[in-house]
Amino acid sequence: MTAPDSTLDPKLKKLIRQDVQSMHAYAIQESSGMVKLDAMENPHRLPAGLQAELGQRLGALALNRYPDGRVNDLRRALADYAQMPEGFDIMLGNGSDELIALLALACDVPGGSVLAPLPGFVMYAMSAQLQGLKFIGVDLTPDFELDEAAMLAAIAEHKPSITYLAYPNNPTANLWDDAVIENIINAVGEQGGLVVIDEAYQPFASKSYAGRMARHSHVLLMRTLSKFGLAGVRLGYMMGPKALIAEIDKVRPPYNISVLNYECALFALEHREVFAAQAQDVVAQRAVLFNALSALPGVKAWHSDANMILIRVPDAARAFEGLRNRKVLIKNISKMHPLLANCLRLTVGTAEENAQLLAALEPSL
């Protein structure tokens, strides 16, 4: 059989934006048969009894119908779980990625821009690019702290529509200084912009901004259930003042959360103590893994408030290939930003997975 031609017809190609043609689709690493420590997933599955109970519940859903008002039950449950302040509202997305894209869509005004520290989550820049908004990246300091002076200067110069602050940051896994964050939030507010605090890794962090967001009318708090333990469900949520959420919600596609997604999320929140225990295990394993990594000659490990640890090795490409050859999959981020030269991002797994990682890493250095 002749393989189909993979070259796009020039007449069709001209319909595709030039900047899109120059991009690459998001690549997912092949992980079959590997110890998978590349994507910051919860390493724990649901206990068998709960898995069976969830299966029965999903099997009873009317999949021939569009999602109904039960999605509002989920919104209320999430608001309760996150202790949403009075006068605030909550918006759901098909993962945080959709919420980030919808923010760019809603804030696409003439001269609008998006600002974020770098290195950071790639979707902040990508959403801006796809929406035709200017993206301003401000480098962190060499020890991955916010460069307050550079951030304030960029805010004053560009007056960004949206400023993202990941708390903790991906891929550096650290929580930034609270006073610096507050100064940035105030500076953005004076310029009439929005600040989005991205708490994707909140289940593993020692602090949250949730208790402080009611101080400001221009701050949104975004989270995801992916790190909670439901990466396969794809559900993110964003909280903010009611009037602000109401405007952004206008660009949300109808029925963007499937009945399967919101029923899984409701089930998880009903059993939140199970997921909280899993998160605490990850935090405990993170400490063990950090100490072991720090003891390896030639390895620099950074303290983490997430379910990942950033390390620097003598040769990232060699270490990555050595780990992959030994059936351990991690993320080589050494080309992502100059500050990340020879850096690898390791997801914290179970005790057994972390032991396999350490056994494979030492001979790979």
From Swiss-Prot:
One Pfam family it belongs to: Aminotran_1_2
Swiss-Prot/TrEMBL catalytic activity: L-histidinol phosphate + 2-oxoglutarate = 3-(imidazol-4-yl)-2-oxopropyl phosphate + L-glutamate
Single Gene Ontology MF annotation: pyridoxal phosphate binding
EC class (word): transferase
Complex and partners: Homodimer.
Keyword set, alphabetical order: Amino-acid biosynthesis, Aminotransferase, Histidine biosynthesis, Pyridoxal phosphate, Transferase
Name recorded for this polypeptide: Histidinol-phosphate aminotransferase
Presence of keyword NAD: no
Cofactor(s) listed: pyridoxal 5'-phosphate
This protein's pathway: Amino-acid biosynthesis; L-histidine biosynthesis; L-histidine from 5-phospho-alpha-D-ribose 1-diphosphate: step 7/9
PANTHER family: HISTIDINOL-PHOSPHATE AMINOTRANSFERASE (PTHR42885:SF2), HISTIDINOL-PHOSPHATE AMINOTRANSFERASE-RELATED (PTHR42885)
Alphabetical list of SUPFAM superfamilies matching this protein: PLP-dependent transferases (SSF53383)
Enzyme Commission code(s) on record: 2.6.1.9
N6-(pyridoxal phosphate)lysine: residues carrying this PTM: 227
Similarity section: Belongs to the class-II pyridoxal-phosphate-dependent aminotransferase family. Histidinol-phosphate aminotransferase subfamily.
Provenance organism: Polaromonas naphthalenivorans (strain CJ2)
GO biological process, one term: L-histidine biosynthetic process
